[in-house]
Design a protein with these regions (language model features):
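Sec-dependent N-terminal signal peptides
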Residues: 4-14
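Acidic, serine/threonine-rich low-complexity disordered tracts
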Residues: 20-126, 168-262
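Active-site/ligand-binding surface loops and adjacent short beta/alpha elements
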Residues: 126-183
């Protein structure tokens, strides 16, 4: 499995109850503001092995995008210095989205994973319901795609912050919601399940009240077998990512909150 799929998976999850619901219910005012920063540590765990292999930072600012107020997100991942010797990894994602409704407007991706490189440049066309995507793979060169768009499609950074605008008062444990995210030339469909509230011991930060979600991939071969990702958001109205767990064939990868600056 490529690290890109792991990184994509690490920050995704949420929900359906008997019959399939629509997009996740959201609140009109988001719980975040410009200047926010979230720092995460990525750890590989297998038996007694529990090693930090990368760091991730998510920053948020506001700007004007084609004449409208918009959010700008940057999600950056860098492998630890010692790990660079074995596998150098750099992930740089940027997402522009509307302040009203968290609708994605543009997305860029620049990836280095060992010898593998890739770039994405998306422009969302909500009138024609299509993503105009320019994708450059290390072994294929630049290619253009027209990716079908629907209201529940997001890129990775936009999806993270869209989930944080959920209206928890309209959700209950067991509810499931279909959600889709676009990367490269494809759209991946997932089912997000709200599992409920529980205390969580966060690495080096102690116990926090948390909301648990799980994620099942329903199309796109990101994992072999029926494996579920899990993630925990802070149960304080800000819904900050506290931890994410992605199972692997051997061991698992965890992302733990290290620092949060509102």
């Amino acid at each position: 499995m490529r690290w890109k799929l792991l990184i994509l998976s690490l920050l995704i999850s949420v929900a359906l109850n008997g019959q399939e619901k629509g997009c996740i219910p959201t609140v009109p005012e988001p719980p975040f503001k410009a200047g926010e920063r979230i720092d995460l540590g990525l750890f590989y765990k297998w038996g007694a092995v529990n090693t930090e292999v990368a760091q991730a930072a998510i920053t948020l600012d506001s700007l004007q995008f084609n004449g409208q107020d918009a959010w700008h997100l940057n999600f950056n991942v860098k492998s630890a210095t010692f790990f660079d010797v074995f596998f150098k990894m750099r992930e740089d994602f940027h997402s522009w989205m509307t302040m009203d409704g968290i609708r994605p407007l543009r997305f860029t991706r620049n990836t280095l994973e060992g010898k593998y490189t890739a770039t994405n440049d998306y422009n969302y066309d909500w009138e024609e319901m299509v993503i105009h995507a320019d994708v450059n793979f290390y072994n294929r060169g630049m290619e253009h795609y027209e990716i079908p768009l629907h209201p529940c499609v997001y890129d990775l950074p936009a999806m993270i912050f869209y989930l944080r605008t959920m209206d928890l008062s309209k959700m209950k444990p067991g509810d499931r919601y279909p959600l889709s995210f676009a990367i490269d030339e494809a759209v991946f469909d997932i089912i997000l399940t709200y599992q409920g509230a529980e205390p969580l011991k966060v690495r080096k930060l102690g116990y926090r009240n948390a909301l648990l979600f799980s994620c099942s991939v329903v199309s796109g071969a990101m994992f072999e077998g029926n494996q579920e990702l899990k993630f925990w958001l802070s149960d304080d109205g800000a819904y900050v990512p506290l931890a994410i767990m992605a199972p692997l064939r051997v061991g698992s990868v965890w992302a733990w909150l290290k620092d949060y600056q509102p």
